[in-house]
């Protein structure tokens, strides 16, 4: 769904654990890391798209997570000119995103990057809350800063004071 301004409707997903860390995933075959995200299909609500993308990209189902909040409005970013496909109609110049903050209720082992036939990510880890703002590709940085600021009080209020154990995918960065 590309709107009349050339922005594709999209959902962004931030998954946090009980330590206030967020899931950070590496794009398949690349060196870039980001939060899960994906397009909203025709006839689909943003929440329906979020649950579909959540399963397709990280293998989690609704019972594995709890929605803590979502952004009050759609946030936009423009694609760099080199990434705009001029040969597709309508031309997509960027994304408009509705973001969701989810709390992981299940164990880390429920995360499965190979749940779909075409994995989006090939690795993931838990990182400190603000780490992604400094690390995401530059054209997404402003949106990440806005969404992380909007979600900060909610996300950080759910963290426990215990130190994360080093088990499984409990890697931390940042």
From Swiss-Prot:
UniProt superkingdom: Bacteria
Keywords, sorted A to Z: Hydrolase
PROSITE patterns: NUDIX, NUDIX_BOX
Cellular component, GO, one term: cytoplasm
Boundaries of every Nudix hydrolase domain copy: 6-149
EC class of the enzyme, as a word: hydrolase
Cofactor: a divalent metal cation
Known EC number: 3.6.1.-
Protein's UniProt keywords contain Ubl conjugation: no
Family: Belongs to the Nudix hydrolase family. RppH subfamily.
NCBIfam families for this protein: PRK00714.1-1, PRK00714.1-4, PRK00714.1-5
Record protein name field: RNA pyrophosphohydrolase
Organism whose genome encodes this protein: Shewanella baltica (strain OS155 / ATCC BAA-1091)
């Amino acid at each position: 769904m590309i709107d009349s301004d050339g922005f594709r409707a999209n959902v962004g997903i931030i998954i946090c654990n009980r330590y206030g860390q967020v899931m950070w995933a590496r794009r398949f075959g690349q060196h870039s890391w980001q939060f899960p995200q994906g397009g909203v299909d025709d006839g689909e609500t943003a929440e329906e798209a979020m649950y579909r993308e959540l399963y397709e990209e990280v293998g989690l189902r609704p019972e594995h997570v709890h929605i803590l909040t979502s952004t009050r409005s759609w946030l936009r970013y423009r694609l760099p000119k080199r990434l705009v496909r001029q040969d597709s109609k309508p031309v997509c110049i960027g994304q408009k995103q509705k973001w969701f903050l989810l709390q992981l209720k299940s164990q880390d082992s429920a995360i499965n990057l190979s749940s779909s036939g075409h994995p989006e990510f090939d690795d993931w880890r838990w990182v400190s809350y603000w780490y992604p703002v400094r690390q995401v590709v530059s054209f997404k940085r402003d949106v990440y800063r806005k969404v992380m600021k909007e979600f900060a009080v909610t996300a950080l209020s759910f963290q426990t004071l215990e130190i994360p154990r080093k088990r499984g995918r409990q890697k931390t960065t940042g």
